[in-house]
């Protein structure tokens, strides 16, 4: 069983790539929350577990993280790109 971790910093439009953003600026959103990310993960078709007390190592503030379970058929990059697209759709 593979667990992938998605931090809000991966999708944050206010961060640079060197600060932790993993998607293109056009796909990123401003200040994503773990709730939005978890909802998008479920829309993509994977199980999501929210851990609110975790912190991304490059950030000072604790924003939490989302564990993506049962994602054996996709790479982490594929999952992050799909989740970014769905978070953008949820915001519209």
UniProtKB/Swiss-Prot annotation:
SUPFAM superfamilies: SRP19. One of its GO terms (molecular function) is 7S RNA binding. Disulfide bonds: none annotated. It is found in: Cytoplasm. Pfam families: SRP19. The keyword Iron does not apply. Its main location: cytoplasm. InterPro entries: Signal_recog_particle_SRP19, SRP19, SRP19-like_sf, SRP19_arc-type. One of its GO terms (cellular component) is signal recognition particle. GO terms for biological process: SRP-dependent cotranslational protein targeting to membrane, signal sequence recognition. Disruption phenotype: No effect on cell growth, membrane protein insertion, protein secretion, or ribosome levels. Keywords: Cytoplasm, Ribonucleoprotein, RNA-binding, Signal recognition particle. Belongs to the SRP19 family. Involved in targeting and insertion of nascent membrane proteins into the cytoplasmic membrane. Binds directly to 7S RNA and mediates binding of the 54 kDa subunit of the SRP. Part of the signal recognition particle protein translocation system, which is composed of SRP and FtsY. Archaeal SRP consists of a 7S RNA molecule of 300 nucleotides and two protein subunits: SRP54 and SRP19. This is Signal recognition particle 19 kDa protein. It comes from Haloferax volcanii (strain ATCC 29605 / DSM 3757 / JCM 8879 / NBRC 14742 / NCIMB 2012 / VKM B-1768 / DS2) (Halobacterium volcanii). The lineage of its organism: Archaea, Methanobacteriati, Methanobacteriota, Stenosarchaea group, Halobacteria.
